[in-house]
Amino acid sequence: MNRIKTLTLLLMIILSVGISAQNPRSVFTDRPVDEAAIYFTPENFNVKTDGRMDVSDALQEALNRTKQKENGCGILFIPEGVYKLSKTIYIPSGVRIIGYGGKRPVFVLAKQAPGFQEVTRETAKGKYLFWFIGGGYRPGGRIGDANAGTFYSSMMNVDIRIEDGNPNASAIRAHFAQHCSISNVTIHVGKGRAGIVDAGNHLEN
Protein backbone atom coordinates (compact mmCIF):
# COMPACT_ATOMS: atom_id res chain seq x y z
CA MET A 1 0.00 0.00 0.00
CA ASN A 2 2.81 2.41 0.91
CA ARG A 3 4.50 1.62 -2.39
CA ILE A 4 1.31 2.43 -4.30
CA LYS A 5 0.97 5.72 -2.43
CA THR A 6 4.58 6.59 -3.20
CA LEU A 7 4.17 5.80 -6.90
CA THR A 8 0.95 7.82 -7.02
CA LEU A 9 2.69 10.80 -5.40
CA LEU A 10 5.59 10.60 -7.85
CA LEU A 11 3.17 10.46 -10.78
CA MET A 12 1.35 13.54 -9.49
CA ILE A 13 4.67 15.41 -9.19
CA ILE A 14 5.72 14.43 -12.71
CA LEU A 15 2.37 15.52 -14.13
CA SER A 16 2.47 18.83 -12.30
CA VAL A 17 5.99 19.55 -13.55
CA GLY A 18 4.92 18.69 -17.10
CA ILE A 19 1.91 21.00 -16.92
CA SER A 20 4.05 23.79 -15.47
CA ALA A 21 6.61 23.38 -18.26
CA GLN A 22 3.89 23.55 -20.93
CA ASN A 23 2.27 26.62 -19.37
CA PRO A 24 5.09 28.74 -17.97
CA ARG A 25 4.01 31.56 -15.73
CA SER A 26 4.92 35.15 -16.52
CA VAL A 27 6.66 36.69 -13.53
CA PHE A 28 6.20 40.25 -14.81
CA THR A 29 2.55 40.63 -15.73
CA ASP A 30 2.41 44.44 -15.72
CA ARG A 31 4.41 46.77 -17.93
CA PRO A 32 7.44 47.93 -15.90
CA VAL A 33 8.00 51.68 -15.70
CA ASP A 34 11.60 52.66 -16.38
CA GLU A 35 12.43 55.92 -18.13
CA ALA A 36 15.93 54.70 -18.92
CA ALA A 37 14.74 51.48 -20.59
CA ILE A 38 13.73 50.84 -24.19
CA TYR A 39 10.44 49.14 -25.05
CA PHE A 40 10.18 46.84 -28.07
CA THR A 41 6.72 48.00 -29.08
CA PRO A 42 5.07 48.90 -32.42
CA GLU A 43 5.16 52.53 -31.29
CA ASN A 44 8.96 52.49 -31.15
CA PHE A 45 9.89 49.95 -33.84
CA ASN A 46 8.44 48.56 -37.06
CA VAL A 47 7.25 45.30 -35.52
CA LYS A 48 4.17 43.15 -35.20
CA THR A 49 3.64 40.67 -32.40
CA ASP A 50 1.60 38.09 -34.32
CA GLY A 51 4.49 35.79 -35.22
CA ARG A 52 4.16 36.36 -38.96
CA MET A 53 6.43 39.38 -39.43
CA ASP A 54 10.20 38.79 -39.28
CA VAL A 55 11.44 41.16 -36.57
CA SER A 56 15.10 40.07 -36.55
CA ASP A 57 16.56 43.36 -37.77
CA ALA A 58 14.28 45.44 -35.56
CA LEU A 59 15.21 43.40 -32.48
CA GLN A 60 18.92 43.79 -33.21
CA GLU A 61 18.43 47.52 -33.65
CA ALA A 62 16.60 47.70 -30.32
CA LEU A 63 19.41 45.85 -28.55
CA ASN A 64 22.01 48.14 -30.10
CA ARG A 65 20.06 51.22 -28.99
CA THR A 66 19.82 49.81 -25.49
CA LYS A 67 23.58 49.32 -25.39
CA GLN A 68 24.20 52.90 -26.52
CA LYS A 69 21.64 54.67 -24.34
CA GLU A 70 22.81 54.46 -20.72
CA ASN A 71 26.56 54.20 -20.18
CA GLY A 72 26.83 51.00 -22.18
CA CYS A 73 24.15 49.04 -20.36
CA GLY A 74 20.39 48.94 -20.05
CA ILE A 75 17.12 47.04 -20.29
CA LEU A 76 15.08 46.12 -23.34
CA PHE A 77 11.50 45.30 -22.35
CA ILE A 78 9.61 42.88 -24.60
CA PRO A 79 5.79 42.91 -24.38
CA GLU A 80 3.65 39.79 -24.61
CA GLY A 81 3.42 38.45 -28.16
CA VAL A 82 5.02 36.11 -30.68
CA TYR A 83 8.17 37.32 -32.46
CA LYS A 84 9.43 35.62 -35.60
CA LEU A 85 13.22 35.48 -36.07
CA SER A 86 15.36 34.16 -38.92
CA LYS A 87 18.96 34.97 -37.97
CA THR A 88 21.35 35.19 -35.04
CA ILE A 89 20.55 37.95 -32.55
CA TYR A 90 23.59 39.37 -30.74
CA ILE A 91 23.03 40.51 -27.15
CA PRO A 92 25.61 43.18 -26.29
CA SER A 93 27.32 43.18 -22.92
CA GLY A 94 25.40 44.86 -20.13
CA VAL A 95 22.04 44.51 -21.89
CA ARG A 96 19.09 42.72 -20.32
CA ILE A 97 16.12 41.32 -22.23
CA ILE A 98 13.06 41.21 -19.98
CA GLY A 99 9.62 40.08 -21.07
CA TYR A 100 6.33 41.16 -19.55
CA GLY A 101 2.60 40.56 -19.92
CA GLY A 102 -0.09 38.08 -18.97
CA LYS A 103 1.89 35.47 -20.92
CA ARG A 104 5.60 35.39 -21.60
CA PRO A 105 6.64 36.74 -24.99
CA VAL A 106 7.81 34.00 -27.34
CA PHE A 107 10.72 34.21 -29.79
CA VAL A 108 10.29 31.75 -32.66
CA LEU A 109 13.02 30.68 -35.06
CA ALA A 110 11.22 30.37 -38.40
CA LYS A 111 11.03 27.07 -40.25
CA GLN A 112 14.13 26.35 -42.35
CA ALA A 113 15.79 29.64 -41.43
CA PRO A 114 18.90 30.23 -43.59
CA GLY A 115 22.13 28.87 -42.09
CA PHE A 116 20.59 26.77 -39.32
CA GLN A 117 20.90 23.46 -41.17
CA GLU A 118 24.56 22.90 -42.06
CA VAL A 119 27.37 22.11 -39.63
CA THR A 120 30.50 24.11 -40.49
CA ARG A 121 33.71 24.90 -38.66
CA GLU A 122 32.10 28.06 -37.29
CA THR A 123 28.89 26.30 -36.27
CA ALA A 124 30.33 23.11 -34.77
CA LYS A 125 28.36 23.74 -31.56
CA GLY A 126 25.33 24.84 -33.49
CA LYS A 127 24.28 28.09 -35.09
CA TYR A 128 23.03 30.29 -32.30
CA LEU A 129 19.70 32.08 -32.27
CA PHE A 130 20.75 34.31 -29.35
CA TRP A 131 24.43 34.99 -28.66
CA PHE A 132 25.65 36.85 -25.59
CA ILE A 133 28.72 38.76 -26.77
CA GLY A 134 31.41 40.92 -25.25
CA GLY A 135 31.08 44.63 -26.08
CA GLY A 136 28.69 46.00 -28.69
CA TYR A 137 27.60 44.71 -32.07
CA ARG A 138 27.97 46.21 -35.51
CA PRO A 139 27.46 44.43 -38.84
CA GLY A 140 30.74 43.21 -40.26
CA GLY A 141 32.59 43.87 -37.02
CA ARG A 142 34.49 41.35 -34.93
CA ILE A 143 32.23 39.22 -32.75
CA GLY A 144 33.50 37.66 -29.55
CA ASP A 145 31.97 35.80 -26.65
CA ALA A 146 30.94 37.50 -23.48
CA ASN A 147 33.87 37.04 -21.11
CA ALA A 148 35.15 37.62 -17.58
CA GLY A 149 34.71 41.34 -18.09
CA THR A 150 31.06 41.03 -19.12
CA PHE A 151 28.57 42.04 -16.43
CA TYR A 152 24.77 42.25 -16.10
CA SER A 153 23.80 40.68 -19.43
CA SER A 154 20.66 38.59 -19.03
CA MET A 155 17.46 37.18 -20.47
CA MET A 156 14.37 36.94 -18.27
CA ASN A 157 10.72 35.93 -18.57
CA VAL A 158 10.67 34.99 -22.26
CA ASP A 159 10.27 31.71 -24.11
CA ILE A 160 12.07 30.43 -27.20
CA ARG A 161 10.82 27.95 -29.78
CA ILE A 162 12.81 26.38 -32.63
CA GLU A 163 10.62 25.38 -35.55
CA ASP A 164 11.27 22.35 -37.78
CA GLY A 165 13.92 22.42 -40.47
CA ASN A 166 16.68 23.84 -38.24
CA PRO A 167 18.66 20.76 -37.14
CA ASN A 168 21.81 22.72 -36.25
CA ALA A 169 20.06 25.48 -34.29
CA SER A 170 21.12 26.18 -30.71
CA ALA A 171 18.80 28.58 -28.91
CA ILE A 172 21.33 30.43 -26.73
CA ARG A 173 25.09 30.74 -26.43
CA ALA A 174 25.60 31.90 -22.86
CA HIS A 175 29.34 32.17 -22.28
CA PHE A 176 29.21 34.96 -19.71
CA ALA A 177 30.39 35.95 -16.23
CA GLN A 178 29.40 37.83 -13.08
CA HIS A 179 25.83 39.03 -12.55
CA CYS A 180 24.78 37.58 -15.90
CA SER A 181 21.79 35.27 -15.92
CA ILE A 182 19.06 33.39 -17.73
CA SER A 183 15.91 33.01 -15.65
CA ASN A 184 12.29 32.05 -16.20
CA VAL A 185 12.99 31.01 -19.79
CA THR A 186 11.47 27.93 -21.41
CA ILE A 187 13.20 26.64 -24.53
CA HIS A 188 11.35 24.36 -26.93
CA VAL A 189 14.21 22.86 -28.91
CA GLY A 190 12.00 20.62 -31.05
CA LYS A 191 14.18 19.07 -33.75
CA GLY A 192 16.95 21.62 -33.24
CA ARG A 193 20.39 20.91 -31.81
CA ALA A 194 20.47 22.36 -28.29
CA GLY A 195 18.87 24.76 -25.86
CA ILE A 196 21.86 26.40 -24.18
CA VAL A 197 25.52 26.14 -25.18
CA ASP A 198 28.41 26.96 -22.81
CA ALA A 199 26.14 27.86 -19.92
CA GLY A 200 27.13 30.80 -17.74
CA ASN A 201 27.07 31.03 -13.98
CA HIS A 202 23.38 31.63 -13.25
CA LEU A 203 20.53 29.68 -14.78
CA GLU A 204 17.19 29.60 -12.97
CA ASN A 205 13.71 28.24 -13.76
Model-derived regions: residue spans:
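Extracellular/periplasmic carbohydrate-active domains that bind, remodel
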Residues: 20-205
